[in-house]
From Swiss-Prot:
This is Small ribosomal subunit protein uS4. Keywords: Ribonucleoprotein, Ribosomal protein, RNA-binding, rRNA-binding. Pfam families: Ribosomal_S4 (PF00163), S4 (PF01479). Residues 42-53 have a biased composition (Polar residues). SUPFAM superfamilies: Alpha-L RNA-binding motif (SSF55174).
Length: 207
């Protein structure tokens, strides 16, 4: 399955919520009607979605938020299911611990997609070692730093400036001058997307 490269706003409209696929400087505006599905006239039917349809839609929404393809998403779910605790919450925490997401959360990338691209271009080190794998699982205490040769990249500088203004999650700490951050701990569920109902995903894979 190929990665989606079409209009980002269309995906958010399809899910009826902002998936934060666009940077803050190009955020969705009133022209993007999230309550209207993609297409010339949007939703034309008031038909009730089945339970399975709702479960499938929730999975698609989370996949699109994190830029994950189906096979990889199934692996994350299997890993979450093996671990102790709430499977749905564990799934979200595994996704939040991806290096491309942590880069985004620390403000070094304006979107997760940009974070993924920067990671693949070897713009960061983890504990002093260059890592170019977007799915790398960051652990508490890990230090993510922008490499010296990448510190002048305009998109990193601009993204960090915007992040400083809007604020960063409590589970990361960032030294903007050094352009490095520490992943302090896995986020609490309350610090992850509130419009995600992970229990629907668990129900889907438990069918």
């Amino acid at each position: 399955m190929a990665r989606y490269i079409g209009p980002k706003a269309k995906l958010s409209r399809r899910e009826g919520t902002d998936l934060f696929l666009k940077s803050a400087r190009r955020s969705l505006d009133s022209k993007c009607k999230l309550d209207s599905k993609p297409g010339q006239h949007g939703r034309t039917s008031g038909a009730r979605t089945s339970d399975y349809g709702n479960q499938l839609r929730e999975k698609q929404k989370v996949k699109r938020m994190y830029g994950i393809l189906e096979r990889q998403f199934r692996r994350y779910f299997a890993e979450a299911d093996r671990r102790k605790g709430n499977t749905g919450e564990t799934l979200l925490k595994l996704l939040e611990a991806r290096l491309d997401n942590v880069v985004y959360r620390m403000g070094f990338g304006s979107t997760r997609a940009e974070g993924r691209q920067l990671v693949s271009h070897k713009a960061f080190t983890v504990n002093g070692i260059v890592v170019n794998i977007a799915s790398y699982q960051v652990k508490p205490g890990d230090v993510i730093a922008v490499r010296e040769k990448s510190k002048k990249q305009v998109r990193i500088v601009e993204a960090l400036s915007l992040a400083e203004q809007s604020g960063m999650p409590s589970w990361v700490s960032v030294d903007a001058k050094k352009m490095e951050g520490t992943y302090k701990a896995a986020p609490d569920r309350s610090e992850i997307a509130n419009d995600v109902n992970e229990s629907l995903i668990v129900e889907l894979y438990s069918r």
